[in-house]
Amino acid sequence: MRNYFLIFLFVPLVFFGQITLDKAPEDFQLFPRDASNNASVVFSGKISDDVDKELKLKVFKDDLLVFEKTLEIINKKFEISSIIKAGLFQYRFELYSKKGENEYLLHKANNVVCGDAYIITGQSNSHASSKKSTYSSSFARSFGVKTGYETYNQDDKKVKWGLATGNCKTCKGERWETGYDGGWFEKVSHGVGVWGMELAKLLIEKHQIPVSIINGGSGSSTIEENMLYPEKISLETSFGRLAYRVDQAGLKNNIKAIFYHQGESDTYSDLAFFKGRKRGIYSNYSENFDILKNDWQRVYKGLKKIYLFQIHPGCGSDFQSEIREIQNEISKKYDNVEIMSTTAIVGHDGCHFSYKGYKEFAKRILPLVSRDFFGERNDKIITPPQLINAYYSGKNEITLTFDQPIELEEYYELKGVRHLMKNQFFFSIDQEKPSIYSVINRLKAKNNEIIISLNTDQKYSSLSYIPNKYYFNTKDMYKGPWIIGLTNKIGALTFSNVKINN
């Protein structure tokens, strides 16, 4: 990032003239910590006249002077730096021009911190705001304006560093007031969304490190709309607007992780449109994710992890099961991609989540971030249950093996109807899309296995867990029952058209 500050000193020009700063900290800026828990803050620039001068830098940590250095200007150029430490304290920088015993303030930056930087992006569930999101912290930061699809205009470019928010001051109307509108298409300065704000809160409280989150989500966006088009960064695209903000924040090479919640808009089998925008075709998702991941790693050089949320049954078209399975496969393909389920999260309305539900996103993903970036060792299992094998264990018996102990919810009652767990598995004879229903006599969970007793001698080739989005033969959105982790109570990852081994 190169910001230019022209400082005209209102004293006789024979002493001072004009100084240009090409590097200087800004108010509320977060500097990314290095492996030693430090960051270097640099002032550099040049002076336009020929009078010899001295500069003095003063650094205050929580208002206590901790560093002071005088520097001579040589050949009209100067550079001076100071090391700051990561932690829950704030720095103030004051740069002075010195002539004799007199000091003249050139630049001041308040509330500067050192910590970690993350990105959240995707479609609407990546950036939902809520009037209930009132938490604010001096150590939770963001940069610029979350704009969605709107052009990043000149006024937006004036918005620099500030305190992150999960709220939306410009949102209004009955749906907003009652919690059914998350400000999906509103511009929000320093907006990080409900669960982004909750994640920042949990990280700050647990690890005592400041956090910056930049959210680039766009409501209803396809994976294509999150990709880098064209090859150069453009403010006309979601990718470009996000990359611009990250670059201007000086974080391009220091993003630790990207959290990606997206896929509902890619559940179509052929060309379709929503509000005039092209929808995504599910069969292209895996290849497109490969491209997106490569572009992220090319633009954000320091990227270490990608946290991918498997989508919940909800808004979208008829191939949600396929997208969820593709997301499973993506997580297995890449060592630096971690997947998290959204099953068994409360408050799903058929497309989005309640305030409480979004907070659960942050609660689930926190232990993974703590493990990956803070070296936390956890005796508990912190990942969602994932199927590792399905096989015939008897003539009329199929065993499903998971990577951890699980338990089953027996049923979910909706509108007076009990939807039984045993009816949420679907089978196929020829490995086409599983659609054979109600062939299970009983289910039993035992440690990390589910034992399925069939009521037929028919041999099946594959099975799926949970329907595409509706309960079978209804228009009621699926809300459970769920397979959940026995110890962590995290909903299992769904699976689709998985081969049943003999």
Protein language model regions, located:
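Bacterial Sec-dependent N-terminal signal peptides
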Residues: 1-20
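Cell-envelope and extracellular/periplasmic
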Residues: 18-502
